[in-house]
Amino acid sequence: MIIDFASHFMTKEVAEKLSTKDNFNRLQKNFIPESSDPEFRIALMRKYGYDMQVLTQSTPILSGLKADEAAEICRISNDVIGKICLWYPDRFIPFVVVSLLDVRSAVNELDRAVKEWGCRGVTIGTNHGNRGLDDPQNAPFFERVCEHDIPVFLHPMDWHSYPLAEDDPGIMRLFGWPFDTTLAILRLVLSGTMERYPTLKIVTHHLGGGMFPFFAHRFEIKLPNLKHKLKKPLSESLNRIYGDTAVDGTAAALPCGHAFFGTDRMLFGTDYPFSPENGEVYLRENLDIIKKWNLPEADKAKILGGNAIKLLKLEMIMAR
């Protein structure tokens, strides 16, 4: 079973709604209209041997929007993705997307999407305006996520206070986004957010942003010198953080990520459709590096789909 945990879905309705927004116009060149067609996706899945995709709305399209605008975009996206997943339940898995610019609205939308569409997870950005994820205002959101017992998928965002976001957005996406993911994890751990919500599960894009696995021991060594004091062992927080394997086909990243996450907390992902050849490069190369990886076949099976089945509680779907 091969499940793509990091497959982005941009609806045509959202693209039309955002067509006048400067930030979206910069991102639009990566938008492949055909990827909004479920039959087009299924044809590619058959071509490369994929069984299912988790459909997630990429959060950078929310950058620069006001709270009410972001909430509307989320509702539109959630309804389209929800319907597609109902039409193709054996192919697509729905994730709700919310904006934490308005936490009450985010909680209401989370409830609605889980009830109406059976969403198996929730996608959020790594920062919201000038607030990090550890901001106390976000507490109701994390409480409700734990009540629903679904994972949170973190997608990096631009920093509008940092000149790279405006001067060279390509550089920001290349290395700024992975660092933003790393910083978001760090803040969730050091703030005690992971401790306060012992059932909270976080899935990080791009293997934890790359930096966290690479500097994991540095973090452990420097932790006693930080002002933040954890009540429980660090491992109790880190053991509920997962990483997807959407590393743009970079095989060398996998052993490093595996040393940090272990087999059971790695989830296969591609970052489709944001690659050359209308997204096919990532579909092909991200799968290829897993198949060629010098890892036991049983471990590969977990990473490619077994872990996603367990995390998203898909056993009943698999039993059909």
Model-derived regions: residue spans:
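Aromatic-lined glycan-binding groove of carbohydrate-active enzymes
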Residues: 189-194, 198-236
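Catalytic metal-binding/acid-base residues of hydrolase active sites
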Residues: 8, 127, 157-158, 208, ...
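Mid-to-C-terminal alpha-helical segments outside catalytic/metal-binding sites
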Residues: 1-5, 9-52, 79-87, 108-112, ...
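Active-site-adjacent C-terminal substructures of enzyme catalytic domains
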Residues: 178-180, 195-197, 228-278
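Hydrophobic faces of well-ordered beta-strands that scaffold small-molecule active sites
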Residues: 3-7, 53-55, 93-96, 122-124, ...
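Acidic-and-aromatic substrate-binding clefts and catalytic sites of carbohydrate-active enzymes
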Residues: 31-36, 62-63, 100-106, 129-136, ...
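Active-site gating loops and adjacent loop-to-helix segments of metal-dependent hydrolytic enzymes
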Residues: 8-35, 160-179, 220-240
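Active-site gating/metal-coordination segments in enzymes
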Residues: 51, 56-185, 191
